[in-house]
Amino acid sequence: MESWLFLIGIFIVALLGKNQSLIIASIVVLFLKLIPYSDKIFPLLNKQGINWGVTIISITILVPIATGKIGFMDLVNSFKSPVGWIAVACGILVSLLSYQGVGFLSASPEVTVALVMGTIIGVVFMNGIAAGPIIASGIAYLIIQLLQIQIK
């Protein structure tokens, strides 16, 4: 019962914040809870969902290349400016933080609740995008390591 109330609460907050992605996500999860074999579906989504999401984002990023909006010369030209180098460095940093984040979430599932709450607050009340839980966990991991805080 608690999970239903929690999900409905997230749905209401998403509605109030007019966040379409979170509205759809909460409706889908609530709907899946109604399906008799959701106990088989949720572990699969929990394990593979992020990979599927990253794949969809990767496909979206590659579409401009497929349509010809971005060509090889655009890639070459991106290395001719400080902005391009900064973008490449940030891409590398985010991928490394995300890698640490996935491991951190697996090793410390209790952190997931806090990250989800932070993501919801950022998405609903600050017009953020819910692409950040993995990166957020990577940043949290980095800060925890820098501060030498022991993880349970």
Curated annotation (Swiss-Prot):
Superkingdom of this protein's organism: Bacteria
Sequence intervals crossing the membrane: 4-24, 52-72, 85-105, 115-135
Protein topology in the membrane: Multi-pass membrane protein
Pfam families: DUF441 (PF04284)
Subcellular location(s) per record: Cell membrane
Gene Ontology CC annotation, any one: plasma membrane
Keywords: Cell membrane, Membrane, Transmembrane, Transmembrane helix
Keyword Transcription regulation belongs to the record: no
Family label: Belongs to the UPF0756 family.
PANTHER family given in the database record: UPF0756 MEMBRANE PROTEIN YEAL
Full protein name: UPF0756 membrane protein PEPE_1090
Species this chain originates from: Pediococcus pentosaceus (strain ATCC 25745 / CCUG 21536 / LMG 10740 / 183-1w)
